[in-house]
């Protein structure tokens, strides 16, 4: 399993609209082969920041499968205008330690 991680900085005053847009965008990513799940959590210390975790079977399921699809174009239209700055997305492999 691959874990995708991004810290999303949402423009001030846009959190409620972002959360609504994110909920409406979930079916777009969920329809991707190799998609295993997603969580978007609000930061408790910094208003307007969110942590996105998405789980994928493979890196390619995200990079080629989702980002290469027409569903990603709609995802971008719904969500990308909320971010300032645009988030850096990283992908992580299997854990080296867990408890």
Feature map (PLM): residue ranges:
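Short hydrophobic/aromatic beta-strand micro-patches
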Residues: 9, 53-55
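Residue-level signal for secondary-structure boundary sites
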Residues: 16, 60-62, 97
């Amino acid at each position: 399993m691959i874990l995708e991680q991004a810290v999303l900085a949402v423009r001030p005053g846009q959190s409620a609209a972002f959360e609504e847009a994110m909920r409406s965008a979930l079916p777009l990513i969920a329809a991707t082969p190799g998609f295993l799940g997603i969580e978007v959590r609000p930061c408790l210390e910094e208003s307007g920041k969110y942590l996105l975790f998405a789980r994928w079977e493979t890196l390619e399921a995200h990079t080629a499968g989702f980002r290469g699809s027409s569903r990603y174009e709609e995802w971008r239209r719904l969500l990308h205008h909320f971010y300032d700055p645009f988030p850096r997305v990283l992908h992580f492999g299997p854990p080296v330690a867990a408890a």
